[in-house]
């Protein structure tokens, strides 16, 4: 089942999507459905998808969790060595709520950045409270999946000279994940039963029509199940939490090609829909 949050007549609503028609189920986003309310009820109205504005499936998720370096190809393109997953743990971080946005929302390059980059990712949405679950049972806690783009600022221009020593470079990387609208998700939330195995999905991203990233989720180092299980050991996962599961190779940093005013990104993961993000703003000089 494909579910959407949308705006019609100035009101946020949610519903089922099929063949370009939305069967409206009620007001608000999909949070109640994700938490256990039925999505099988009778429609209160119908809308043509083209006549409404599709929003992020969840407008205020409790947590936006992300993993770094979860595809060997992405590690290799950045100059890293092959990894043995038995000897490492997932590298998790959190994005602020202000990073989250939906399809068609503009990403404005902040003045502090000279190098805004793209990262298409599969996003898993938690549907049940999970604490200390095993990888074998972890997928039963996932409500569904959507497309995401972990837009990242590779360089920060602080406006003064700095010594890049110690852990400064790490914190620059971390803070480069915080920009407003740098975590678009959508357009559809596809229920887990329809996806089946999340490790079989094509994952792609285009910039201005040029294919930049093209791989499959089978190439993840840590599977979705392993990531959910690991995160549930760190903290309690609750319905509506979203987990961005890492990006494949093909990011702009590899060639020094970054986003500019007027660019358009299109991210797509299997049946989760094409997530369009227009880019505005002019980058400032880097340190």
What are these regions (language model features)?
Residues 1-91, 204, 264-268, 283-287:
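N-terminal non-catalytic cap/leader segment that marks the start of a structured domain
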Residues 20, 97-98, 127-131, 151, ...:
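Short loop segments at secondary-structure junctions
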Residues 86-104:
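A gly/proline- and charged-residue-enriched helix-loop-helix capping module
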């Amino acid at each position: 089942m494909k579910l959407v949050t949308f705006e019609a007549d100035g009101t946020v609503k949610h519903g089922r999507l099929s063949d370009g028609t939305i069967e409206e189920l009620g007001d608000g986003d999909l949070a109640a459905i994700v938490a256990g309310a039925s999505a099988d009820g009778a429609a209160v109205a119908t809308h043509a998808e083209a006549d409404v504005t599709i929003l992020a499936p969840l407008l205020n998720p409790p947590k936006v969790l992300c993993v770094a370096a979860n595809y060997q190809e992405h590690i290799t393109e950045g100059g890293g060595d092959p990894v043995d997953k038995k000897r490492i743990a997932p590298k998790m971080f959190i994005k602020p709520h202000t990073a989250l946005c939906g399809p068609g929302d503009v990403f404005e390059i902040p003045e502090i950045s000279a190098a805004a980059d793209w990262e298409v990712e599969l996003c898993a949405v938690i549907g049940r409270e999970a604490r200390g679950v095993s990888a074998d049972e972890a997928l039963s806690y996932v409500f569904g999946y959507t497309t995401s783009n972990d837009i990242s600022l590779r360089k920060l221009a602080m406006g003064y000279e700095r010594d890049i020593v110690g852990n400064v470079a790490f914190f620059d990387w971390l803070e480069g994940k915080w920009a407003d609208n740098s975590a678009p998700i959508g357009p559809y939330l596809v229920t887990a039963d329809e996806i089946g195995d999340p490790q079989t999905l094509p994952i792609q991203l285009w910039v201005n029509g040029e294919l930049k990233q093209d791989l499959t989720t089978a190439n993840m180092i840590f599977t979705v199940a392993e990531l959910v299980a690991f995160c549930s050991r760190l903290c309690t996962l609750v319905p509506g939490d979203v987990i961005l599961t890492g990006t494949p190779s093909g990011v702009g940093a590899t060639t020094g090609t970054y986003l500019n005013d007027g660019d358009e990104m299109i991210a797509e993961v299997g049946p989760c829909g094409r997530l369009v993000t227009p880019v505005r703003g002019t980058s400032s000089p880097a340190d």
